[in-house]
UniProtKB/Swiss-Prot annotation:
PANTHER family: PHOSPHOENOLPYRUVATE CARBOXYKINASE (PTHR11561), PHOSPHOENOLPYRUVATE CARBOXYKINASE [GTP]-RELATED (PTHR11561:SF0)
GO cellular component: a single term: cytosol
SUPFAM superfamilies in the cross-refs: PEP carboxykinase N-terminal domain, PEP carboxykinase-like
Disulfide bond entries: none
Described function: Catalyzes the conversion of oxaloacetate (OAA) to phosphoenolpyruvate (PEP), the rate-limiting step in the metabolic pathway that produces glucose from lactate and other precursors derived from the citric acid cycle.
PROSITE patterns recorded: PEPCK_GTP (PS00505)
Binding, Mn(2+): K224, H245, D292
Protein name: Phosphoenolpyruvate carboxykinase [GTP]
Organism expressing this protein natively: Neocallimastix frontalis
Binding positions for substrate per the UniProt entry: R75, Y215, G216, G217, S267, N386, S387, R388
Domain of life: Eukaryota
Length: 608
């Protein structure tokens, strides 16, 4: 039978299924084949169970809405662990517990936890099946919601089993909602066990176990758990690879020459918007390879090549509109799973920021409560601030053909950036690869008044990887630095830093969105070695006067002056903040990184 364990021949997988079923005692076992028919059947099952609502087939063909438990709505960093053999290998940015202690805890929670449920076995490939940068995982879960989302987010099914063959290896990813069902017991519409959430990575074993949560980032284990936390470990072991929280975009100039750029930004800095940008400058075209994760590897030619290991977008819905990101909106017009957004009277979805006006008629909020604009009741959050859409990469109208390339795409430039109201210029280029690593290690965003910390405080998020690095971040900086020693720096990507968010008296100085293509144009011209377009400053290379293409753009010269000037005095206090942050890594902070920061300080002092 196609979906029974008898269809499995891989030795590691057979042992994994046996060990999992003996511990968790499911009522039956189902091996996923990744077919459209299977997806349809599971969605129908989820509708029957009350977990999915089918949306209006005319407005949103083949789309469904799910509502989670109100307490299970986001990644939970406090419940996320890197259980390395030694505590120092997890480092100061990760939670740690001794592996033996964690396993005892998990085994206690998982004994019989799938009682009355089906155990789904999901063989998946991160990246094109059989590609040199791609890797395989198998997720075992008791959640059909996880299965259908994984079928969008990764390449699932028989081809992966064929690739594994008898002796192939994979990363085992075990997930359970920890909600066993007794005979005749009515099931919940969102099984979870909030008080027992653990999202655990065992780096030496290349193994993931996540229990208690049914939510995306905690339950779709191919995503952050594998594609970043375990993949950072695998990449360092390989010695020639990186696994990064980066978008990948293709940019073609008017002469038809194409380049690829990766970019890492902390959350709420517009990563998906940049990945799906519509360029505003004539003759330039931007296409999307991926919006969240990049796996990179040095190719035979000495260049760094990248793949998007995912096959879908798990996008934040609120704030996404036809104005802010038309391509993201088009990508979720069909074949999409929505989680925790509002349901309109005509069977469509809505979220804050989608349109100026709230739709007329009755709306069911993400909490399943009825509300309407004319009810006289104050408007609640109709969609949860972290509500999501899960859509296929193929749906995006600006998809880049490089997404399908087995060997990936060659990367010419890397961008880091944060949300900074002052000090940090619109764009600058690092002086070298090692100086670029300093930029990555000091990525930061200012907290807003809405955050718990005082407004204007810096929250550092090195490489935008703070919650996602699977080993000690000091070692991670050292591994990045090693690329300059091991490889020809001339062939490595040029590194840049951007900041779209400079303000003056509360007013943004740069229009952002599609106009950011003007900054990408300058970056590509720097990659091409165009003369006379950059000026050297203590922090790196900035656009020379007149070098940024501002044609047809109405930005006052005084504003451009502000965002393209280095305030050395303000930057010296920046250096102090970076030094203070770096001190948390103690003796594992690489000396070469300290030397880069010292040199930056000297250049700034000399320029005063």
């Amino acid at each position: 039978m196609a979906h029974s364990v008898s269809s499995v021949v891989n030795k590691q997988l057979l042992a994994y299924i046996k060990e999992s079923s003996e511990l968790m005692t499911p009522k039956d076992i189902y091996v996923c084949d990744g077919s459209a028919e299977e997806y349809h059947n599971l969605c129908e099952l989820l509708v029957k169970q009350g977990i999915f609502t089918k949306l209006n087939e005319t407005k949103r063909p083949n789309c469904y809405l799910a509502r989670s438990n109100p307490a299970d709505v986001a990644r939970v960093e406090k419940c996320t662990y890197i259980c390395s053999e030694k505590e120092e290998d997890a480092g100061p940015t990760n939670n740690w517990m001794a592996p033996a202690e964690m396993k005892a805890k998990l085994n206690g929670l998982m004994k019989g936890c799938m009682k009355g449920r089906t155990m789904y076995v999901i063989p998946f490939s991160m990246g094109p099946i059989g590609g040199p940068i791609s890797r395989v995982g198998v997720e075992i879960t008791d959640s059909p919601y996880v299965v259908v989302n994984m079928c969008i987010m990764a390449k699932v099914g028989k081809k992966v089993l064929d690739l594994l063959g008898v002796d192939g290896t994979f990363v085992p990813c075990t997930h359970s909602c920890l909600a066993p069902l007794e005979e005749g017991q009515k099931d919940s519409t969102w099984p979870c066990n909030i008080d027992n959430r653990y999202i655990v990575q065992f780096p030496e074993e290349h193994r993931i176990v996540s229990v208690g949560s049914g939510y995306g980032g905690n339950a779709l284990l191919g995503k952050k758990c594998y594609a970043l936390r375990i993949a950072t470990v695998l990449s360092r072991e390989a010695g020639d690879s990186l696994a990064e929280h980066m978008l990948i975009l293709g940019i073609t100039n008017p002469q038809g020459k194409k380049y690829y750029i990766t970019a890492a930004f902390p959350s709420a800095c517009g990563k998906t918007n940049l990945a799906m940008l519509n360029a505003t400058i004539p003759g330039w075209k931007i296409e999307c390879v991926g919006d969240d994760i990049a796996w990179l590897k040095i190719g035979k030619d000495g260049r760094l090549w990248a793949i998007n290991p995912e096959s879908g977008f798990f996008g934040v819905a609120p704030g996404t509109s036809y104005k802010s990101n038309p391509n993201a909106m088009k990508s979720c017009e069909k074949d999409t799973i929505f989680t925790n957004v509002a349901l309109t009277e005509d069977g469509d979805v809505w979220w804050e920021g989608m349109t100026k006006e709230v739709p007329k008629g009755k709306i069911i909020t993400w909490l399943g409560k009825e509300w309407s604009a004319d009810s006289g009741e104050p408007k609640p959050n109709l969609a949860h601030p972290n509500s999501r859409f899960t859509a296929r990469v193929e749906n995006v109208p600006v998809g880049d053909p490089g997404y399908y390339a087995l060997e990936g795409v060659p990367v010419s430039a890397m961008i880091f950036g944060g949300r900074r109201e002052n000090t940090v210029p619109l764009v600058f280029q690092s002086r070298s690869w090692k100086h670029g690593v300093l930029l990555g290690s000091s990525v930061a965003s200012e907290t807003t008044a809405a955050a718990e910390a005082a407004a204007g405080q810096l929250r550092f998020d090195p490489f935008a990887m703070l919650p996602f690095c699977g080993y000690n971040m000091g070692d991670y900086f050292g591994y990045w630095l090693s690329f300059a020693d091991k490889y020809d720096e001339a062939k490595l990507p040029k590194i840049f830093h951007v900041n779209w968010f400079r303000k003056d008296n509360g007013r943004f100085l740069w229009p952002g969105y599609g106009e950011n293509s003007r900054v990408l144009k300058w970056i590509i011209e720097r990659v091409e070695g165009k003369e006379g377009i950059a000026k050297e400053t203590p922090i790196g290379y900035l656009p020379a006067k007149g070098a940024l293409d501002l044609s047809g753009l109405d930005v006052p010269e005084a504003d451009m002056e502000k965002i393209l000037t280095v305030d050395c005095k303000a930057y010296l206090s920046e250096v102090e903040k970076i030094r203070q942050y770096h001190s948390k890594f103690g003796s594992l902070l690489p000396k070469a990184l300290i030397a880069e920061l010292d040199a930056l300080e000297q250049r700034l002092k000399a320029a005063l």
